[in-house]
């Protein structure tokens, strides 16, 4: 009779214990001074202004959508810090491949505001980006941008470019097949890609607890060999 093997006993313990890296508490207090970024007062003020701008953009876009004046809009409420903080670290040479909820990053990366609204209304010019703007239009298919980001990153590597490709998805996107394909190939080819999961706890109406048994979504990168 075959003996049962406890797979968990064969895995390294740290694969199952990802400690949360935290700089600020929910109340805004510093909990780890060693991780504080070296930012000037002016840079901190700019980041705060960007987040307030994103909240106002969300509120006005939501109002336009409910009035029937804006065709498609995915709310960004509550994700200002993750969206604007991550895009603030990028260079103009870096490529961003957004999902449909990542319009604020596109605008802060250099997309003219009216282009974002043309895209939301389904106008063809909303996908006509300037030649020197390193980004792609928002991906409507959840998680599909992960495969595309891997391809762009691999192209940057092959061409010797000092740049990265960045993409975002939610916790629901991390359950999609394209997500796994993207991180698998990126790990195999060591592509300069940054995969950002914005875990708000829900995939439309499906809670995080029903999407994955993994204690943390970061663990999904272990099998792909991504740090």
Language model features with spans:
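A short, flexible beta-alpha/helix-coil linker loop
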Residues: 29-30, 103, 200-203
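Cofactor-binding active-site loop characterized by glycine-rich and histidine/acidic residues
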Residues: 56-59, 63-189, 207-214, 218-225
